[in-house]
Swiss-Prot record:
Keywords: NAD, Oxidoreductase. The keyword Signal does not apply. The gene is mtlD. NAD(+) binds at residues 3-14. GO terms for molecular function: mannitol-1-phosphate 5-dehydrogenase activity. This is Mannitol-1-phosphate 5-dehydrogenase. One of its GO terms (cellular component) is cytosol.
Length: 387
């Protein structure tokens, strides 16, 4: 069995690639990072260090690596003969990997089983996005690729922090992970991945993860940044920050229970498990890493505005989520392009215009005015400091 995985970074090596390896697949990593691909091509193995309640070290071997910029022909051949294609490249990069995936599918031989494609990204229905990009390629014109590939949405969860210098290809990750896959796409022919969970309805699990893990993690980062703390574990050790994060997850729990029918007890247990993960002192995760890309995190259907908007539509004032949104508006990091862009948006135009640009909310949405007030407050702070 063979899997082609796009994205040979820490998540690719320490999560998706590891599980595919453990399932018995030969893994072909594809990436545009020339130095990383060269390291992988020269290596026989690398180690994944799992830290937390059940520490362990796993060795990954039986892999190869290709530069997707300079070795496209070889990559097409690998896709044409693979069983699985996965990605961990970031949702905005899917459109760039779609062309070679389409060419690889087109090159598959007659009678081969459909290629099983899964985008493992921190985004809702990312595989649908990839499928649309593939379908838009010339190779797919006239339904030419119909029946040659199946696309299944997934929900993935594993904290992989910035790595210590000098680790090489080795990766440090938390011991917890979750890879939930939509079973219905495979029509009874699910791939053999023992570490994954297959479900008939994925949407509740995607939103549970996004509105608990991602919302909570980013909340800890932004509240921690406001408190002048460096690491996520330090932030969660601060009583005020921990209480703020807990209040945010109480609101998202309320939404998830009402919307998807999770029992209050089951969701509370999930929240408690997530909070324990955030306190893991063995993960050197920083508020700057987790807080980066604030514009994406503040966008319409993401981890803050998404649940806050739905609660507002249900007549609930999401006070804790609004507090997290306020903290996110105050996040600064000169090394992060989105943080710089956010500051630029806040510095120009009215509060209403900035709110619309940042959040994508319509002015008549019940959440809009509350967020616009927060934006106006942040604009006043910035104006005062620049005066």
């Amino acid at each position: 069995m063979k899997a082609v995985h796009f994205g040979a970074g820490n998540i690719g090596r320490g999560f998706v690639g590891l599980l595919l390896h453990n399932a018995g697949y030969e893994v072909v990593f594809a990436d545009v990072a020339e130095g990383l691909i060269a390291q992988l091509a020269d290596a026989d193995s690398y180690a994944v260090h799992e830290v937390g309640e059940s520490p362990a070290v796993q060795t990954v071997d039986n892999f190869r690596a290709l530069n997707s910029n300079t070795q496209e022909a070889e990559l097409i051949t690998e896709i044409a003969t693979a069983d699985i294609v996965t990605t961990a490249v970031g949702p905005h990069i899917l459109k760039f990997v779609a062309p070679v995936i389409a060419r690889g599918i087109a090159a598959r031989g007659a009678g081969m089983a459909p290629l099983q494609v899964m985008a493992c990204e921190n985004a809702i229905n990312a595989t649908d996005v990839l499928a649309r990009e593939v379908a838009s390629r010339p190779e797919a014109a006239g339904g030419a690729l119909d029946g040659q590939a199946v696309f299944a949405n997934t929900a993935v969860d594993r904290i992989v922090p910035n790595q210590e210098a000098g680790q090489g290809l080795d990766v440090t990750v938390e011991s917890f992970y979750e890879w939930v896959i939509d079973r219905t796409a495979f029509a009874g022919s699910e791939p053999e991945i023992p570490g994954a969970t297959f479900v008939d309805e994925l949407a509740p699990y995607i939103e549970r993860k996004l509105f608990t893990v991602n919302t909570g993690h980013a909340s800890a980062a932004y509240f921690g940044f406001e408190a002048g703390l460096e690491k996520i574990s330090d932030a969660m050790a601060d009583q005020d920050v921990a209480e703020d994060v807990r209040a945010v997850l109480e609101e998202t729990k309320q939404l998830l229970v009402a919307k998807h029918g999770f029992s209050n007890e089951a969701q509370e247990a999930y929240v408690q498990k997530i909070l324990v993960r955030f306190t893991n002192p063995h993960l050197p995760d920083t508020v700057n890493r987790v807080g980066r890309a604030p514009l994406r995190k503040l966008s319409r259907h993401e981890r803050f505005i998404g649940p806050a908007a739905e609660l507002a539509e249900r007549g609930v004032v999401p006070e804790a989520l609004l507090g997290a949104i306020s903290a996110a508006l105050r996040f600064t990091d000169p090394a992060d392009a989105e943080a710089t862009e956010l500051a630029g948006i806040l510095a120009s135009g009215s509060a209403a215009d900035a709110t619309a640009r940042i959040t994508g909310l319509d002015p008549d949405h019940p959440l809009f005015n509350a967020v616009s007030t927060l934006v106006e407050e942040r604009q006043a702070e910035l104006a005062a400091t620049s005066a």
